[in-house]
């Protein structure tokens, strides 16, 4: 599995661990609930069953609609707000979920998110979601945060 695919898998696991609805972003969900959420987003984004399968199997998006599916899930989990910007509080929680706990690096999740919050992102929310995803992984690596294996 390529490095980027592996990172995408972990990001999606982290996102899906945070919550299922915008009202309860930090509730854990199971695979069935994640599929339900992805299918809800499928209808909203024009994504296909294949795009949902790709998301559920943690493969990189190939089509624009698949990126939009990812953005939709991020918005429903309040990782990304309705204007396409990173939600600092929820993104920090995401980084904490995704990384192994290291007391010496307690401030690192906030630093990761601060860097990613400041990046120039495309106006298109679908492409922005992907840009944030890449930034989070890059910054986690730079801050020495190890990804939690799920």
Curated annotation (Swiss-Prot):
The keyword Secreted belongs to this UniProt entry's keyword annotation: yes
UniProt-listed CDD domains: PBP_GOBP
SUPFAM superfamilies from the UniProt entry: Insect pheromone/odorant-binding proteins
GO process annotations (BP): sensory perception of chemical stimulus; sensory perception of smell
Tissues with expression: Expressed in the antenna, mostly on the anterior surface of the third antennal segment. Also detected in the maxillary palps and in cells at the bases of the taste hairs on the proboscis and internal taste organs of the head.
Cellular compartments per GO CC: extracellular region; extracellular space
Compartments (UniProt record): Secreted
Main subcellular localisation: secreted
Coiled coil: none
Range of residues in the leader sequence: 1-23
Gene: Obp19d
Disulfide bonds: 41-72, 68-126, 116-135
A Gene Ontology molecular function term of the record: odorant binding
Pfam families: PBP_GOBP
Designated name of the protein: General odorant-binding protein 19d
Keywords: Disulfide bond, Secreted, Signal
InterPro entries, A to Z: PBP/GOBP, PBP_GOBP_sf
Keyword Magnesium: no
């Amino acid at each position: 599995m390529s490095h980027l695919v592996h990172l995408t898998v972990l990001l999606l696991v982290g996102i899906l661990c945070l919550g299922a609805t915008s009202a309860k972003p930090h509730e854990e969900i199971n695979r069935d609930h994640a599929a339900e959420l992805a299918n809800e987003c499928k209808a909203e984004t024009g994504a296909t069953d294949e795009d949902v399968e790709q998301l559920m199997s943690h493969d990189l998006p190939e089509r624009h609609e698949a990126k939009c599916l990812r953005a939709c899930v991020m918005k429903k989990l309040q990782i990304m707000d309705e204007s396409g910007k990173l939600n600092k509080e929820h993104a920090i929680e995401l980084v904490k979920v995704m990384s192994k706990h290291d007391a010496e690096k307690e401030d690192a999740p906030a630093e990761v998110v601060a860097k990613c919050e400041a990046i120039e992102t495309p106006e298109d929310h679908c492409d922005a979601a992907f840009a944030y995803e890449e930034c989070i992984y890059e910054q986690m690596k730079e801050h020495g945060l190890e990804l939690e294996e799920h």
